[in-house]
Amino acid sequence: MRRILTVVVMSLLLLSCADASVKEYKLQVVAEYPHDTESYTQGLFFHDGQMYESTGLHGKSTFRKVDLATGKALKKFTFDKKYFVEGSVVFGDNLYILTWDSKVAFVYDAGTLEYKSTWSYPREGWVITTDGKQLIASDGSATLFFLDENFALKKRLIVKYEDRPVRWLNELEYIDGKIWANVYTTDEIVIINPKDGRVEGVVDCRGLLPKSLYTKDTDVLNGIAFNPSDGKIYLTGKNWPKMYEIKIVEKK
């Protein structure tokens, strides 16, 4: 299981005080929904108004079509225990699902969810999203990889806060022309300019899940989904009991 010591993670809440051009945001919870506590959330997204989720861990990895109102899987398929599933996204007619350390990615039919093919993937798979024109992926470093539908590399982009690379980019979502990424093991989301990689905003997500709801299995924030149909944004975490519809409000 992928675990990274928090001491090696950049504290963007501290860094955000150094650059006045980087906007700081807090969360406003609009609504909350149940979330399956067995879901070690790796990827979360909407396609045609429907929520989908990929979940990880060897022997427990799944992909599921999720009923937002109940948190239950309307449809689910599992993977061989050798695979640790990571991020997922629909681009064109394909559903793409990454694996962490197996150096493969799976492609399914986006409409039927039927398996189509397995592709070689040249790096660790962490997360993947799309801007509607290309795939955008992270390997947990400070680099974002822009890929075509066959995973051919189109460009690399280094994400930076001021002049410092921002590592551990995890769970990407393309929202209104920007790339949102939560920074693994932190309660922070960075908002990235996809043209130059500059961090333009930091979202403070501390306290989103109340401590009273924590169990021994509750893990970190990981799950950002934007529904283009209505403009709503949702957050959750690994093995969290709740999914939250949120808005961000600039800090005064």
Region locations from a protein language model:
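C-terminal motif of bacterial Sec signal peptides marking the signal peptidase cleavage site
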Residues: L15-S16
